[in-house]
Amino acid sequence: MERLNRHLAEQLAARGEVTVVGPAGIAAHAPDGVRVIEAGRGALWRFLSGALWQGLRSARRRSPDVVLAGSGLTAPMAWLAARASGARAAVYLHGLDVTVGHPLYRLVWHPFLRRMDRVVVNSSATCGLAEGIGIAPERIRIIPPGVALPEPIDETERLHLRRMCRQRHGIGEGPVLLSVGRLTSRKGLLEFVRDVLPLIADKWPHVQLVIVGDPPDDALAARAQTPRQIREAAHRAGVEDRLHFLGRIDDEELESVYLMADIHVFPVQEIPGDPEGFGMVAIEAAAHGLPTVAYAAGGVVDAVADGVSGRLVPPGDSAGFADRVIELLQRPLPIEPMLAFAAGFSWPAFGDRLAAALGLESMESGIMD
């Protein structure tokens, strides 16, 4: 979410003047051309109260066209700042912004979400959730997050980078499946290792699973799956020797890992109160010519073009998931349509859609992180 809000501010700043009100330390990560006001340190309530105060001051001074909350958490502050300055109030919502079950959040935050002049959501699934809490459909616009498109490379360079990455991580020449993301129950990696990977290994004995990511330090409604738990599940399933945990890696190495892999697996689980809002990692994979096999859960259906950038499987169908992986290993999808699909999610395209949704041509926009 932090990275998304940075790109959000950057895209709006390319179209007008932007002031960001955010937590302490945000100035060090703000894009060029953005005015930054830091609000509150330590406890969440300090940030929220500071964001409200600084947002009101900034909005009254600068008379913005729009005050935009970068998530549901800051929606009340954005709405109040907008009303104090005569601006339009808007919010960018993720699935968890709507489904958080805390009674206070539902009592106080949901009414502010319903009052917003514009509600931008990250997927059709989040749109349904937003309508479910009473947000008027005519106020909602669906704009998935963007992705940084890599520089084009030819097949010779692709094969070279693939070979070098495998050597760095000690991975042989068999098929490589890739999982990228935080290790939470929603991501379903333990279930994949337990129920799906053995079926694939029966057909492809040398298949390997590369895992990028760690359990979350702290996330709303997230329940962690630890590497130890995943290894234990793999041991019981007889596939422990197929696993390679890389932990957190930088963006440059992640690009190489995408090129190294044959298929990105995204076995997202349907967990009440913990939806997968979109699935940007599937777009990132497609941008590198890597197809995704995923369960058709939540916003993932917007992130994977079935038959173009990967395959979608009914949630919970372990055998079907394995079959789709095996099918793509035997008959890979062409890369060019995959790259074209991902190109539609570039950050400039995201910025154009967002500006249109907010009714902005020339503007000054306040953003609450």
Predicted regions and their residues:
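Acidic donor-binding loop of glycosyltransferase active sites
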Residues: 242, 248, 259-274, 290
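Short His-centered aromatic/hydrophobic patch
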Residues: 69-75
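Conserved donor-binding/catalytic core segment of Leloir-type glycosyltransferases
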Residues: 160, 171-187, 193, 197-198, ...
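Short hydrophobic beta-strand element within catalytic cores of glycosyltransferases
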Residues: 282-287, 291-294, 304
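Donor nucleotide-sugar binding/catalytic pocket of nucleotide-sugar-dependent glycosyltransferases
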Residues: 19, 114-163, 171-172
